[in-house]
């Protein structure tokens, strides 16, 4: 079963609905804690190659007008594993967004300075005054069975697209996921080889299940029951935003914050899911054709 991998679209309540409602209704300025787990993208360990002992100093900053303290903490190995922001804010979600943007910038600068890879692995948010907490860490699904004989059928001309899809699935960055998934979808939309020029029958549509599984129901509900081709056409705008950031850094997808960042994550997820559907349908079509010829 396909599952969304991106962290950006996930922030789940850990406490009661009543505590979350109190937090949302509270307009007073108070302490909001935002902690980020960091990881090495190569080893996948939840720590980065910075000695925690070297970054003990508590930093003072102002993020979007909110006074903020930033503290770094290490794990058992002595490497930096978590960065915690204490923000004076009346809105936990706004505090989280400001902290996320700040840490993205800091990690980019640290990466340049040290030449080591580092990224965000997950986060937690707390509003102590209202006893409300949210958390986002990677989902750890159960293992699936695989029939090696059933998946042995993979036509040679499809293999380049299968590798593109693999890149989309493996991507931790929604922008990279969208680029690779869109490349598969664009090929399908244009009827270019290895896809058939003949329209698929029945024509694939965007189902409610696809929107729910990808998390895109809130930003792409209008595509429900619409031809998949219409979704692919709409995804071009998002693809262009990602490419624009490569040509004019800061003006494209990298500059997205708040709601726009969430939408990019969700659109990347539905592009991923849609690309998978087109490839699975194409493999099924060819297998059926081969079986028909054999009979």
Swiss-Prot record:
Pathway: One-carbon metabolism; methylamine degradation. This is Methylamine utilization protein MauJ. The gene is mauJ.
């Amino acid at each position: 079963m396909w599952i969304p991998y991106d962290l950006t679209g996930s922030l789940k309540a850990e406490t009661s609905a009543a505590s979350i409602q109190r937090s949302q209704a509270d307009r007073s300025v108070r302490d909001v804690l935002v902690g980020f787990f960091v990881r090495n993208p190569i080893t996948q360990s939840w720590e980065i190659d910075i000695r925690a002992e070297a970054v003990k100093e508590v930093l003072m900053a102002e993020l979007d007008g909110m006074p903020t303290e930033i503290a770094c903490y290490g794990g058992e190995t002595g490497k930096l594993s978590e960065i915690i922001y204490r923000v004076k804010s009346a809105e936990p979600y706004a505090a989280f967004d400001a902290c996320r943007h700040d840490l993205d910038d800091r990690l980019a600068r640290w990466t340049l300075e040290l030449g080591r890879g580092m990224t965000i692995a997950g986060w937690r948010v707390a509003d102590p005054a209202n006893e409300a907490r949210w958390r986002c860490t990677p989902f750890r699904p159960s293992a699936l069975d695989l029939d090696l004989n059933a998946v042995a059928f993979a036509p040679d001309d499809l293999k380049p697209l299968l590798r593109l899809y693999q890149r989309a699935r493996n991507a931790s960055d929604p922008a990279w996921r969208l680029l690779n998934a869109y490349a598969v979808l664009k090929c399908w939309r244009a009827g270019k080889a290895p896809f058939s020029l003949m329209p698929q029958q029945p024509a694939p549509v965007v189902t409610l299940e696809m929107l729910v599984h990808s998390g895109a129901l809130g930003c792409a509900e209008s595509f429900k029951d619409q031809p998949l081709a219409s979704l692919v056409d709409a995804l071009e705008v998002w693809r262009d935003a990602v490419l624009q950031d490569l040509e004019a850094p800061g003006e494209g997808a990298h500059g997205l914050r708040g709601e726009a960042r969430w939408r990019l994550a969700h659109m990347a997820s539905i592009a991923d899911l849609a690309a998978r559907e087109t490839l699975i349908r194409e493999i099924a079509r060819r297998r059926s054709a081969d079986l028909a010829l054999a009979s």
